[in-house]
Curated annotation (Swiss-Prot):
Keywords in alphabetical order: Lyase, Pyridoxal phosphate, Schiff base
Quaternary data: In the presence of PdxT, forms a dodecamer of heterodimers.
Gene field: pdxS
Family that this chain belongs to: Belongs to the PdxS/SNZ family.
Name this protein carries in UniProt: Pyridoxal 5'-phosphate synthase subunit PdxS
Pfam families in the cross-refs: SOR_SNZ (PF01680)
Length: 295
């Protein structure tokens, strides 16, 4: 079984504290304050939301530290920031700034197409994306304290987040029903470390929280992901690319909390204005699919 150190328990515990909440992408102090006032449990500080990163193309990097510090100074809730996959120095810079979490994120252009960070080397906890139990288990083995679906960021299309959440949860059920002497073969076939699979089998769940991310654009989307077993919700472009960010932010927070109250969700959805413009996944070229980054 994976040896969980005291530091690792603290990191995982910090992520557990966000359970049931909404984490919102913000690009400045004003947006961070809107998110906090709407009830977000944390914010993700970055230069551009995923929809703008997708539209701009080119190489997407860690945000200017000035933006991160501005957001940190504006709110009392935890602040996260993204680094590129495998970028040792971006991660160290963000850690030195004092962020509460680092997202080793496929939304940014990977710095290393072979290696992810050894997240156990850092004091700050990490969140990482996953599409299946193999990716989830590898990130946990590297020291991730929190997971999220990859979805397809910046599209306003929930279909990929749904696919990833269902896939991970189906595979958790499969692992739970395997005999222990069958786990090694399963580990070989999925690329999932055996010790992590053993921990998942014994717990009957992932040992870290798994949030929904990538395509959440409406209160109903958020409630859907919670019903599918998400521990909480990340909203990237869905808030500040909508017609009325303040209303959307509050509505998504409420829908995440009361995800089985359909009358409330109906009322929350009234008069919100237009959600962000969505993208049909089938129209994306292979190189435009952010979820394919990392392994």
């Amino acid at each position: 079984m994976t040896n969980v150190t005291g530091t690792e328990r603290v990191k995982r515990g910090m992520a557990e504290m966000q359970k049931g909440g909404v984490i919102m992408d913000v690009v400045n102090a004003e947006q961070a304050k809107i998110a906090e006032e709407a009830g977000a449990v944390a914010v993700m500080a970055l230069e551009r939301v995923p929809a703008d990163i997708r539209a701009a193309g080119g190489v997407a990097r860690m945000a200017d530290p000035t933006i991160v510090e501005e957001v940190m100074g504006a709110v009392s809730i935890p602040v996260m920031a993204k680094c590129r996959i495998g970028h040792l120095v971006e991660a160290r810079v963000l850690e030195s700034l004092g962020v509460d979490y680092i997202d080793e994120s496929e939304v940014l252009t990977p710095a290393d197409e072979v290696n992810h960070l050894n997240k156990r080397d850092y004091t700050v906890p990490f969140v990482c994306g996953c599409r299946d139990i193999g990716e989830a288990a590898r990130r946990i083995a590297e020291g991730a304290s929190m997971l999220r679906t990859k979805g397809e960021p910046g599209t306003g299309n929930i279909v990929e987040a749904v696919r990833h959440m269902r896939q991970v949860n189906a595979e958790i059920r499969q692992v739970a029903n395997l005999r222990e002497d069958e786990l090694m073969t399963y580990a070989k076939n999925t690329g999932a470390p055996y010790e992590v699979l053993l921990e998942i089998k014994r717990l009957g769940r992932l040992p870290v929280v798994n949030f929904a991310a990538g395509g959440v654009a409406t209160p109903a989307d958020a409630a859907l992901m919670m019903q599918l077993g998400a521990d909480g919700v990340f909203v990237g472009s869905g808030i500040f690319k909508s017609e009325n960010p303040e209303k959307f932010a509050r509505a998504i927070v409420e829908a995440t909390t009361h995800y089985e109250d359909y009358e409330l969700i109906a009322n929350l959805s009234k008069g919100l204005g237009d959600a962000m413009k969505g993208v049909e996944i089938s129209t994306l070229l292979p190189e435009q699919r952010m979820q394919e980054r990392g392994w």
